[in-house]
């Protein structure tokens, strides 16, 4: 889809004009102008009750006298001054649904006149594009009959505001990153294994002059002492690979980088502590942390942000086997701490603890890890907010600000010293689980033992990384949050 922002005349020929109307006869400037061009036809529709402004209600008019546009699509925007981001996205989805039923190739949107509560025109345009791209997403790679695609090619926003071009640029890059994350995450685990993740990282680096790649294989991990990471991989014939993408684009090439670390369990059966069969297929999504880091790196490369950023995809697979690690094993991690394994299904933190130690070599400005880490986080927060744990208030607040800006929501969980008590082991420095209570927090507390040398935050996306049911599939979260956080670091 090609997106543009420019002033257009209502008399201009096009396939379709999209116009918003509020409830209680609150009309926009363009509504009144079109009403004059059509000799009061729109007001007649209002008086007859056909046009009410009810949220997401649409009416499609064709070949109106006085308009060169083939169609006029009017959409209800609810009460003026009360339109939220969520409602606005419903409006865009309603517009798309109606347009899909026509052969519309070009649209001129006057929804730029619609006011979002506490938002400016930049967000009006950015939310529109991101919603369009997210709604139009299809993953039919393995279907013999492909999904019907929209014929819509051009979407023009009626404005010449300077912010509009920036909104289009940001939205295009973030949407591209989200799509990349969704595509990788939706791949079946017989194809998307750690080697496949590394191959995708290689392709991304080869297609960007600003990105470079280093792949750490099991032999190098063994030399580095990444025994916790390697233990998780022992039950699988698919070897572990940790892909390290480097984006070195700050004016000062030696500036400390921001590091993103993504959990990349391409399939998690739980190992010897085997998961129940129900919904186990969804454990292909246990690499959504790595997928979101991949998508974020793609987005910032497209935006050419003047930052130094490193993205780590910690690829691994957790399966039961005669060689698999066991409950009761004691592992020596890369930083020297020992961990007693009480549950092999608490494997993500074992992979991450060594990855978090590995990135110390970059002397990072800060580190954010992203992981589908705990079912406890889903129980606590549901499927709307990612869980945030951090030892740094400024970093946590910056991430929450980005979450609010993008509506890629997050909620901060506490991380006080008491939670470390639950991780005590009689045989090792730490246990890999902390008991029944506060599981999302104790998982974060476990990771905090490996982040003493830098500012750190942890995002648990177990509830937000994918959807179940009829709309089953990866969401691409939190690419939007992470990219916005990085955009904000430039300001």
Curated annotation (Swiss-Prot):
- In Pfam terms, one family for this protein is Peptidase_M17
Name-wise, this protein is Probable cytosol aminopeptidase
Q: Gene of origin? A: pepA
UniProt-listed NCBIfam families: PRK00913.1-2 (NF002073), PRK00913.1-4 (NF002074), PRK00913.2-4 (NF002077), PRK00913.3-5 (NF002083)
Where does this protein come from, organism-wise? Answer: Haemophilus influenzae (strain PittEE)
Where are the disulfide bridges?
none
Membrane-crossing residue ranges in chain numbering: none
Mind listing the GO molecular function terms for this protein? manganese ion binding; metalloaminopeptidase activity
Q: Where does Mn(2+) 1 bind?
A: 268, 345, 347
GO CC annotation terms, alphabetical: cytoplasm
Q: Which domain of life is it from?
A: Bacteria
Role of this protein? Presumably involved in the processing and regular turnover of intracellular proteins. Catalyzes the removal of unsubstituted N-terminal amino acids from various peptides.
Instruction: Identify which cofactors the protein needs according to its UniProt entry.
Output: Mn(2+)
Q: What is its EC number?
A: 3.4.11.1, 3.4.11.10
Question: Could you give the cofactor binding note from the entry?
Answer: Binds 2 manganese ions per subunit.
């Amino acid at each position: 889809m090609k997106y543009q922002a420019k002033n257009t005349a209502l008399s201009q020929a096009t396939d379709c004009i999209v116009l918003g109307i509020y409830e209680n006869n609150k009309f926009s400037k363009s509504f009144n102008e079109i009403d004059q061009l059509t000799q009061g036809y729109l007001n007649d529709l209002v008086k007859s009750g056909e046009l009410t402004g009810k949220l997401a209600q649409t009416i499609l008019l064709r070949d109106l006298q006085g308009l060169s546009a083939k169609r006029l699509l009017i959409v209800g925007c609810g009460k003026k001054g009360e339109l939220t981001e969520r409602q606005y996205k419903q409006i865009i989805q309603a517009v798309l649904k109606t347009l899909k039923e026509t052969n519309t190739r070009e649209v001129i949107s006057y929804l730029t006149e619609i006011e979002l509560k506490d938002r400016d025109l930049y967000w009006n345009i950015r939310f529109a594009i991101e919603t369009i791209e997210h709604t139009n997403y299809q993953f039919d790679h393995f279907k013999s009959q492909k999904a019907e695609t929209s014929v819509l090619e051009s979407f023009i926003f009626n404005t010449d505001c300077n912010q509009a071009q920036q909104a289009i640029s940001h939205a295009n890059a973030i949407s591209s990153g989200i799509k990349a994350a969704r595509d990788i995450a939706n791949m079946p685990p017989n194809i998307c294994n750690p080697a496949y993740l590394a191959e995708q990282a290689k392709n991304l680096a080869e297609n960007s002059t600003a990105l470079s790649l280093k792949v750490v294989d099991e032999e190098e991990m063994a030399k580095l002492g990444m025994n916790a990471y390697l233990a998780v991989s022992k039950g699988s014939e698919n070897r572990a690979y940790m892909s390290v993408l480097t984006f070195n684009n700050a004016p000062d090439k030696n500036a400390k980088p921001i590091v993103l670390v993504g959990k990349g369990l391409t399939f998690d059966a739980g190992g010897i502590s085997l998961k129940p069969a129900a919904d186990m297929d969804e454990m292909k999504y246990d690499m959504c942390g790595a997928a979101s880091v991949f998508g974020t790196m793609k987005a910032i490369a497209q935006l050419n942000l003047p930052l130094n950023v490193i993205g780590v995809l910690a690829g691994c697979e957790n399966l039961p086997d005669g060689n698999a690690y066991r409950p009761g094993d004691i592992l020596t991690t890369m930083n020297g701490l020992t961990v007693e394994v009480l549950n092999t299904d608490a494997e993500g933190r074992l992979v991450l603890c060594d990855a978090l130690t590995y990135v110390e070599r970059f002397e990072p400005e800060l580190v954010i890890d992203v992981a589908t880490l705990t079912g406890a986080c889903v129980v606590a927060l549901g499927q709307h907010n990612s869980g945030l744990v951090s030892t740094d208030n400024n970093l946590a607040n910056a991430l929450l600000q980005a979450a609010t800006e993008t509506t890629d929501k997050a909620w901060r969980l506490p991380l006080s010293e008491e939670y470390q008590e639950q991780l005590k082991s009689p045989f090792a420095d730490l246990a890999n689980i902390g008991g029944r209570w506060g599981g999302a927090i104790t998982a974060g507390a476990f990771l905090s033992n490996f982040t003493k040398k830098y500012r750190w935050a942890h995002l648990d996306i177990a509830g937000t990384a994918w959807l179940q049911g009829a709309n089953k599939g990866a969401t691409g979260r939190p690419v939007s949050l992470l990219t916005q956080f990085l955009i904000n670091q430039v300001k």
